Each structure stands twice: as C-alpha cells, then as structure tokens.
Amino acid sequence: ASYPDNIKSGIPRASAVLILNDPQTGYPYALLEGALISAVRTAASAVLGAWWLNGQNRHAATLSIIGGGVISRNILETFVADDWSFDSVGIHDLNAESAQALAEFGEQLGLPDVRLLSLEDALTADIVVFATSAGEPYVKGQGTFRPGQIVLNISLRDIGAEIIEESYNYFDDITHCLKANTSPHLA
C-alpha cells in the first residue's frame, strides 16, 4: 500500500505484508514487513531490464534517476552490485533535499561524476529511470526521447500518453501496467 503523506511523518511511503507459509502444511510461520523486499525486487527487475535493453552491456555513458526515494536508492545500489559502469550519473527530484541525499548516496557507492540535474537535462541521459510517486503525467510531448534511448518507467504516471504511443514498450506485468491510470493505461 502507498501512503505518500507518510513521508511527512518520517515513515516510509509504502508498506507491504508478506506471509511465509509452511510448504508442507500451508500454515503461516512468518509475517514480514515487505517494503524492503518489494523495493529490492523492483530494483532488480529494473536493472535486469536495462541490461537486456542495452544489449547485455553493463556500460552506459550517462544514467539519470528521476525521483529520490527508496526505489531510486535500491536501483543505484543494484546497478553498482551488478558491476555497471557510467561516465556520469544525474539525479533529479522536485524535493531538493531528496535529490541531494540520493546524489550523496550515489557518491558513497563510488559512482562517478554524480550531479544534480534539471528535469530537462535528466531526460537526455542514455538510460533514464523514473521512480517517483507522481499522480499524473508531467513529461509530455512527442520527440522528448531520442531513438535508442532506454527509459525505465518504474513509476506509474510520469510519462504522457503521446510518448508511450510513439515508443517501443516492454512490460513485465501487462495487467498491472494497464490499470489505475498509469502512463500506458492512459495511452
């Protein structure tokens, strides 16, 4: 479940509950808070997708992360753990403190040339990752992205319908992506 106002209270925006069941009896034997598990899974799927879309190559000149939250932190960590290399990494978030914190985290991970970028500049990277909680599309207009650019739309609603319609789209869960007014659903 997602509760964006939780952040104002200093608690995570998202929460989930996982129940582990005994494979023999089906009875539950563990109840886990699953937000971290979900974040790690989301990051792993994003980085795996980037690897396939990038021709099984773990290098890109530029990476931009749009959104400075937990998912973005996990995505940066996963890129590093998977031995990716970048010449520079750009960070953008509407909240300057979140952007700065993610940039500092990227530097701690050893990523090179980590810098804060405007949205316009962030959209020019070779790999662009959206990981925000935007309620409606704010990146709009045909021709926003160039051919061959990899855009990982981890978020639900950052990208306008016209961009989705002019792009090659790959979905890991079509049913999930085509509901709740997500960018693909709106297209």
Regions found by a protein language model. Give the residues of each.
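Short acidic low-complexity segments
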Residues: 110-125, 140-142
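Short internal alpha-helix immediately C-terminal to a glycine-rich phosphate-binding loop
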Residues: 41-62, 70-82
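Rossmann-fold NAD(P) dinucleotide-binding segment
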Residues: 127, 135-155
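Short glycine-rich, flexible loops that bind phosphorylated cofactors or substrates
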Residues: 136-138, 159-160, 178-179
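Short, conserved loop/helix-junction motifs that constitute active-site signature segments
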Residues: 83-84, 142-147, 162-165
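NAD(P)-binding Rossmann-fold cofactor-contacting core
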Residues: 82-106
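Adenosine-phosphate binding glycine-rich loop
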Residues: 164-187
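N-terminal ligand-binding/catalytic initiation module
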Residues: 1-39, 47, 187
